[in-house]
Amino acid sequence: MAITHDELCLLACNFLQKNGFKVAFHDRFRAWTPYGEQADAIGFRNGASCLIEAKCSRSDLLADRKKPFRIEPEKGMGDWRFFISEPGIIEISDLPEGWGLLHVVKGRVKKVHGWPGNWEWVNRASKPFSANKQAECDYMFSALRRMDLRGHLKEVYDGVIINKPEPTLIEGEE
């Protein structure tokens, strides 16, 4: 049974988080960006951003090429950009310059082409794209603004919770 677009987006987001992009969003998050780009999955880590576009069909891949931020890559988000699909939909020969490819096989993401080594993510000379940092900033602002509107923004001052200890019961409490 074919994987749905929503499933690909969730797999891509989880994949980003497991690969060092601890702040990651999937396609259910919508935000205003200068050129209308809505990421299927995008992740951020110190010094780098990674965009993943989910494709369930070749026609979707071909339609993607007509978007203004694909025609002019400097308008798009992501220092690194990948397509994710099931095998047989996108081949390495289909990739635009600088793009990488991930395939989903038996529910697992496989690195097919272009996934860099750990040190390459932040090396400017290694990055295939100069991402539109204003669009990325607008995207992040939208996420933080929503947290502020819900009264959660002040939690950023609480620091990072590494290993939160389990609460202990005092003898006699249930």
Tell me the role of every PLM-derived stretch.
Residues 3-19, 93-174:
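Non-catalytic C-terminal interaction segments of nucleic acid-processing enzymes
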Residues 17-18, 44-46, 74-77:
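Flexible, charged surface loops at secondary-structure boundaries
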Residues 26-27, 84-86, 104-106, 114:
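Conserved beta-strand termini and adjacent loop/short-helix elements that scaffold enzyme active sites
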Residues 29, 42, 55:
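Anionic group-transfer/hydrolysis microenvironments
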